[in-house]
Amino acid sequence: MAINIRKTHPLLKIINHTLIDLPAPSNISLWWNFGSLLGLCLIIQILTGLFLAMHYTADISMAFSSVVHICRDVNYGWLIRNIHANGASLFFICIYLHIARGLYYGSYLYKETWNIGVILLFLLMATAFVGYVLPWGQMSFWGATVITNLLSAFPYVGNTLVQWIWGGFSVDNATLTRFFAFHFLLPFLILALTIIHLLFLHETGSNNPLGINSDMDKISFHPYMSYKDILGFFAMIFFLAVLTLFIPNLLGDAENFIPANPLVTPPHIKPEWYLLFAYAIFRSIPNKLGGVLALLFSILILMLVPLLQTSKQRSTIFRPMTQILFWFLVANSIILTWIGGQPVEQPFIMVGQIASISYFSMFLIIIPFASWCENKILSLN
C-alpha cells in the first residue's frame, strides 16, 4: 500500500491534522466561519502593513506627508492603504461576532482557548490604537494624547509611566517612533498567540450549536468545512472590496485629514468606532482612576464568564430567558458604541451611565441569575 506523505512527513503531518483530517462536528453553522475569517484578516493586515511600512516615515515632520505620498505616488498605494484601514474595521467586526458566538453557544467553557482569545482581543485593540496614531493627523495626535494620559490616573507611578511611554514631556517624535515599532511588532505576537489559541482548541475539538459532545458524529475538515470557509472568504473579500473601493472613508474620522497640530484641539476627541464601547464606559465614571479600571474591566469581564456559568446546559439554544438577555447585551453594546461617539453632554451622559451599569450587570448578575432560574424551572419538570 502506498504511503500517504501528508500523514507521515513531519511538517505536512501538522498541516494535515490542522486543516485536512481534523475531526469537526457535522452540525456547526456559519457562525463557526469567523475563526478562519480572522486568520484571513490577519494575513491581509500583515501583508498590506508590510508594503505600507516600506514607504512610511516614522517622523513627525514627514509622517503625514509620507501617507499622502503613499496614496498619490506609490503604485496602488491608495488601494493598499484603504485595504489596511478598512481591514482593521473588518477584523474587529469578525472578532466581535466570534466572541458573540462563543457567548451564545457556550464555547467559553474551553477556558484556555477562551482566555487566550481575550488576550488576543487586548493585543488587537493595542495594535489598532498605536496604528491609528501613525498617520499623524489631528485625531491621531489628540487620541494618542488623551488615551496615553489615562495612565496618569494610577497613584504614585502614573505621571512617570506617561512620560516613559511618551519618551518626553508630550506626545512627540519619540512617541511616534516607538508606536511604529509596536505596530510592526504586535501583529507577529498576535500570530504566535493565534497558533497557541488553535493548539488549545484542537486539544478539545470544536463546540457545536447544541453544546453537547459530538464525538460520535464528526466529519473531516476537508472538504466539508474547508469549502464552507472558502465561501466565507469570498463573501468577506467582496465586503472589503465594496468598503475599500466605494466608501473607503466611511468608518474613519474627517479630523484625520488635517495634519497634527498641538495648538488646536478638535471639538470632540474620540477613538475609532471599534473602541467606542469601552471609551463610553470609561467616560461614564466621573472618577479618572475608576474610569480607567472600568475600561479595563469591560474587556477583562470576558475572563469571568466561564466562572459565572450557573446553567446546567452549555448552549443557550434551549434557554429562552438567556437568549433574550444575550440580545439585550448585544443591543446594550451597540448603544455604548453610539454613546462613545457623542459629545459629553446630556442626555448622552445619562444614557451612557445606564448602559454601562447594565453592561456589567448582565455579565455579573442578570444572566447568571436567569440561568439559575432556568435550572429551577427544568427541575420542576
UniProtKB/Swiss-Prot annotation:
Please, which domain of life does this record's source organism belong to? Eukaryota
The answer to whether the entry has keyword Lipoprotein is: no
Q: Which InterPro entries match?
A: Cyt_b/b6_C, Cyt_b/b6_C_sf, Cyt_b/b6_N, Cytb/b6-like_sf, Cytochrome_b, Cytochrome_b_C_euk/bac, Cytochrome_b_N_euk/bac, Di-haem_cyt_TM
Residues that coordinate or bind heme b b566: 98, 197
Looking up SUPFAM superfamilies in the UniProt record yields: a domain/subunit of cytochrome bc1 complex (Ubiquinol-cytochrome c reductase), Transmembrane di-heme cytochromes
What's a single GO MF annotation on this record?
A: metal ion binding
What does this protein's UniProt record list under function? Component of the ubiquinol-cytochrome c reductase complex (complex III or cytochrome b-c1 complex) that is part of the mitochondrial respiratory chain. The b-c1 complex mediates electron transfer from ubiquinol to cytochrome c. Contributes to the generation of a proton gradient across the mitochondrial membrane that is then used for ATP synthesis.
The UniProt record's further free-text remark is: Heme 1 (or BL or b562) is low-potential and absorbs at about 562 nm, and heme 2 (or BH or b566) is high-potential and absorbs at about 566 nm.
Q: Partners and quaternary state?
A: The cytochrome bc1 complex contains 3 respiratory subunits (MT-CYB, CYC1 and UQCRFS1), 2 core proteins (UQCRC1 and UQCRC2) and probably 6 low-molecular weight proteins.
What is the recorded name of this protein?
A: Cytochrome b
Q: Tell me which species this is from.
A: Galeocerdo cuvier
